[in-house]
Amino acid sequence: MTTQDELKRIAAEKAVEFVPENEYIGIGTGSTINFFIEALGKSGKKIKGAVSTSKKSGELLARYDIPVVSLNEVSGLAVYIDGADEVNHALQMIKGGGGAHLNEKIVASASEKFVCIADESKYVSRLGKFPLPVEAVESARSLVSRKLLAMGGQPELRIGYTTFYGNQIVDVHGLNIDQPLTMEDEINKITGVLENGIFARDAADVLILGTEEGAKVIYPCQG
């Protein structure tokens, strides 16, 4: 039986095919992305540079001599490669288990194409089993938590974690996310919320799943 890490590697290696040469690209954060950076580094493909969404990804890119640039230095990105904690048939996602979802949304929105890579366990019919991360300013944490509770969720402060921007993460369990786009917007309207981990407005254009049968390329609502 193929291990989860092996499935992640299968998806990551396939994703290298979606990277155009001599372009700037965006790189996400997480264990699957670590496999992708390794595969890209070993592929011999030449890119102008990569915008990283986290320090860890940036350090790994540098290890493979892939130039790391700031989003402010480029006019746009050809493709954004990132993983997901959950992804549905419309390629809407929950992301942010690593706490970098604000940066990830910024870079995704600057990219012409979003390629999501994941092992097959992340492909779900409905979002919400994975806790939804919500980034909030510290002074509004209690207010934000009460609002999320009123929406039907069970908020839990991520203890001992501070985001890149110095904010806190509230992980919300048990939300009914039947309409991801609406839920994403409603949560972001709460005063004190910087961003939440629903990627419906910035859904993926392509999903590459690592499966027991190999890499499977999926487009929105293909099923």
Swiss-Prot record:
Keywords: Isomerase. Belongs to the ribose 5-phosphate isomerase family. Homodimer. The active site is at 104 (proton acceptor). Catalyzes the reversible conversion of ribose-5-phosphate to ribulose 5-phosphate. This is Ribose-5-phosphate isomerase A. GO terms for biological process: D-ribose metabolic process; pentose-phosphate shunt, non-oxidative branch. InterPro entries: NagB/RpiA_transferase-like, Ribose5P_isomerase_typA_subgr, Ribose5P_isomerase_type_A. Substrate binds at residues 29-32, 82-85, 95-98, 122. Pathway: Carbohydrate degradation; pentose phosphate pathway; D-ribose 5-phosphate from D-ribulose 5-phosphate (non-oxidative stage): step 1/1. Its EC number is 5.3.1.6. CDD domains: RPI_A. PANTHER family: RIBOSE-5-PHOSPHATE ISOMERASE (PTHR11934:SF0). It catalyses: aldehydo-D-ribose 5-phosphate = D-ribulose 5-phosphate. Gene3D superfamilies: 3.30.70.260, 3.40.50.1360. GO terms for cellular component: cytosol. Pfam families: Rib_5-P_isom_A. It comes from the Bacteria. It is an enzyme of class 5 (isomerase). It comes from Neisseria gonorrhoeae (strain NCCP11945).
